[in-house]
Amino acid sequence: MRRLCEAGVGHVFLVTGRGILFLTDALAREKALTSVSTYHEQGASYAAMAYAQAKNSLGVCLVSTGCAATNAVTAALCAWQDNVPVVFISGQHMLHETTHYTKHPIRTYGSQEADIIKVVQSITKYAVMLHRAEDIAAEMDKALYLAMTGRRGPVWIDLPLDLQNARIEPEQLTRWMTNAVPLQVRAADVCAVAEGLSRAARPLLLLGGGIRSAGAQQVVSDFVDKSRIPVVFTPAGADAYGASHVYSIGAVGSIGGSRAGNFALQHADYILAVGTKLSSQMTGNRTLFAPHACITVVDIDVLEHQKEEAAHKFIHADARAFFEALREEAVHPANEEWTMQCIHWKRVFSVPEEDFVQKAAQRNEIDLYAFSYVLGKELADDAAVITDAGFEELIVP
């Protein structure tokens, strides 16, 4: 629990149980942590995920063993697919009564024992069962590092009951340190992008959720203010630059995309896509995607962009570091005629569209796009809103 505090965690979401008796006691004793108990493990796991997204930091979910742990698996999958750094900590039977440790080919040693690590290995960045109490510091160091580094995602630590109650001397524990070489932005890549944007008649920035994960919103805003290049965004990147800015044209894609954003995308001749995996929901038929554009992708995940060839050039870099370097380059301001054309599309194909709002009012109905627009005007910038997936994916962007 102390290590979670050191990582900046303030809240732990949980459903207690006999498999985490000692962990729950440790949580209660750690005054810097606030425990939030939910009615169900799925609620705790999704709360931890939402917490991580809201704070752009670590979320923590604590659950017991067996079906208590499997109740959190759906949220782990969601965190894996949405790049959310959540630490899942599950309780477990005594070490020598677990199939994971003994390797005995039986289904279970008894009530509530299950090999959760095998279940979650394919949907986490790191999953481990602790075998020795003295390894806890190193395993926590590694898990926390991996959750927050590179393309973020969930990690899972399974703690047997007897090891939870083991006596250790924290100062004497072995710690883990990465030997990974920090990712560097290549000057040649930055220069090539600056030249491409400057030469283009119709340049466009395509921003994804990776902008937020990298903490790059401010440097992106600085760059756009300087270059006046129109911006479109994926539904996951709606807050990467901000839809209310004058150069923000709209969301793109078949789900949640705007007509203005898609028009800009299809007419651009140079696209710099940053922090997006260019999913098929966004590109549609890749042979018809942005047919006039030279596409450069900057992303933290190399593997994601090996699945299909959507980009002409891929740059492996952190979004914030890349934009900080690009901001210092002499990028020519975008062609004013092109910028005004994009702004014109945004104005003509506004969201919500006025004729639809009027027709809904005549039928005494509520237009969801209009509702979203008004709600956004009334809420504080840091307000939290709980909605279903359709509203968040289709209406809000």
Regions found by a protein language model. Name each.
Residues 17-19, 93-94, 159-165, 209-211, ...:
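Glycine-rich beta-alpha junction loops
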Residues 14-15, 88-90, 158, 229-235, ...:
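Short internal beta-strands
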Residues 25-32, 100, 118-123, 167-178, ...:
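Gly-rich Lys/Arg/Thr-decorated short loops/hinges at beta-loop-alpha junctions or inter-strand turns
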Residues 92-137, 237-346:
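Glycine-rich, acidic loop regions that bind phosphate or pyrophosphate groups
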Residues 1-10, 50-56, 146-151, 189-204, ...:
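Glycine-rich phosphate/diphosphate-binding loops that line cofactor/substrate pockets in enzymes
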Residues 1-8, 18, 23-30, 346-397:
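Active-site diphosphate/adenylate-binding microenvironment
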Residues 21-101, 260-262, 267-279, 394-397:
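Thiamine diphosphate
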Residues 114, 142, 146-199:
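Conformationally flexible catalytic loops at phosphate/diphosphate-handling active centers
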